[in-house]
């Protein structure tokens, strides 16, 4: 079996040597594109014994962020792979480390033939002296990525300006995607809140409507669910939670579904298709849905097999939308205790997942449901190391079409 590792570097001297060392542990070849680096990237590539092929752009070309668009760069790497014809390809960014707890070669050798690509967790380093515990107090720094796939002739890149997955756009023509335990990608960038804010501002200049980010707002994605103009609120919430100053939680109050196995498939806030007024949790069919807080059932709606339950308490409405199982249904006026089971989540069409759309409203409009939960001391994001794929794919996708007026 032959494994080809690939990356694209531009002034990556700070991280490149460590990235190459981590790839050399299991790969037979490492191919690299050096995109007009002016630091010591070229020297590192020339001296690293595991690097077997380098394509360099002329250094005197204009100093744009990348010489060619991301999709064209991926195509060049794919065509380089055609000259190697490996069994497996791993592609990473030049500031990613690959950490393994397994014999990766042995695992790939026994991977079923119908699995043609593999996802694994990516963890961002965090080293912010001003906000040292922002992760995990405000959210997670883990996400699934797809760095590994089988080589086939004719693989092609996605056509977006940026944020194309590393794996080929047509890889699923050859089989299905699996998940690879025991391997982690460690991202060296975005290790402080200030770096994340700068990255959000950079992406918004390039893609103000986040069309290339799968329709997901950059600030909500990188700033733990907060908008760019809510950074002061993020900092204030962090300081509150560090002090243990949480909003009151009723006896029995809990997350709407258990932490494991659970994933956030779609977050709250602006998306390319409109304003999403809640958060969508993906979980296994049959998972119970619980009332976060007590109240009375004030509305029940059913559309296309989905049930929408609204539980009202004082000036707060909490909405739960899911495809129910076969249990008995609630009726208008039912009094619900905090922590009571509202139902179970049914399967969603052809997907192996079930989904819960969770929404919180006040008289002033919708509020961020993740912030609502976390400010009571409930952490709705998955615990470290327990990521779950959504719909078995990357990027995560949910069938939710609920939108509302921007608050």
UniProtKB/Swiss-Prot annotation:
Q: Name one GO molecular function term.
A: metalloendopeptidase activity
Answer whether the UniProt record assigns the keyword Signal to this protein: yes
Note the superkingdom of the native organism: Bacteria
Tell me the SUPFAM superfamilies matching this sequence: Duplicated hybrid motif, Nucleotide-diphospho-sugar transferases
Signal peptide range equals: 1-27
Q: Which GO terms describe its cellular component?
A: peptidoglycan-based cell wall; plasma membrane
Decide whether keyword Thylakoid is in the record.
Answer: no
Q: What is this protein called?
A: Uncharacterized protein Rv3786c
């Amino acid at each position: 079996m032959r494994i080809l590792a690939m990356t694209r570097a531009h002034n990556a001297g700070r991280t490149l040597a460590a990235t190459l060392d981590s790839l050399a542990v299991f790969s037979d070849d490492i191919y690299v594109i050096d995109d007009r680096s002016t630091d010591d990237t070229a020297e590192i590539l020339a001296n690293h014994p595991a690097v077997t092929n380098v394509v360099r752009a002329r250094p005197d070309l204009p100093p744009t962020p990348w010489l060619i668009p991301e999709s064209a760069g991926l195509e060049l790497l794919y065509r380089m792979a055609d000259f190697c014809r490996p069994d497996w390809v791993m592609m990473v960014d030049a500031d990613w480390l690959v950490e393994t707890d397994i014999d990766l070669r042995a695992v790939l050798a026994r991977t079923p033939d119908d699995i043609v690509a593999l996802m694994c967790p990516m963890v961002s380093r965090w080293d912010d002296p001003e906000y040292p515990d922002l992760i995990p107090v405000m959210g997670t720094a883990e996400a699934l990525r797809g760095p590994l796939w089988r080589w086939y002739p004719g693989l092609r890149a996605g056509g977006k300006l940026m944020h194309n997955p590393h794996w080929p756009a047509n890889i699923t023509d050859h089989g299905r995607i699996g998940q690879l335990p025991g391997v982690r990608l460690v991202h060296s960038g975005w290790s402080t809140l200030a770096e994340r804010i700068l990255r959000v501002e950079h992406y918004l200049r390039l893609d103000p409507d986040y069309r290339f980010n799968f329709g997901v707002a950059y600030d909500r994605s990188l700033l733990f669910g907060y908008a760019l103009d809510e950074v002061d609120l993020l900092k204030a919430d962090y300081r509150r939670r560090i002090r243990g100053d949480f909003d009151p939680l009723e006896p029995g109050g809990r997350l709407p579904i258990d932490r494991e196995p659970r994933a956030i498939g779609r977050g709250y806030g602006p998306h390319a298709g409109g304003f999403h007024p809640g958060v969508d949790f993906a979980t296994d069919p049959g998972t119970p849905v619980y009332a976060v807080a007590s109240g009375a059932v004030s509305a029940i709606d059913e559309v296309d097999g989905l049930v929408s339950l609204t539980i009202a308490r004082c000036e707060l409405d909490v909405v739960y939308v899911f495809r129910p199982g076969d249990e008995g249904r609630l009726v208008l006026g039912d009094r619900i205790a905090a922590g009571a089971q509202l139902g179970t989540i049914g399967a969603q069409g052809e997907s192996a997942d079930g989904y819960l759309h969770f929404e919180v409203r006040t008289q002033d409009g919708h509020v961020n449901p993740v912030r609502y939960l976390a400010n009571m001391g409930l952490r709705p994001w998955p615990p470290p190391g327990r990521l779950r794929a959504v719909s078995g794919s990357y990027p995560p996708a949910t069938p939710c079409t609920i939108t509302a007026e921007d608050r």
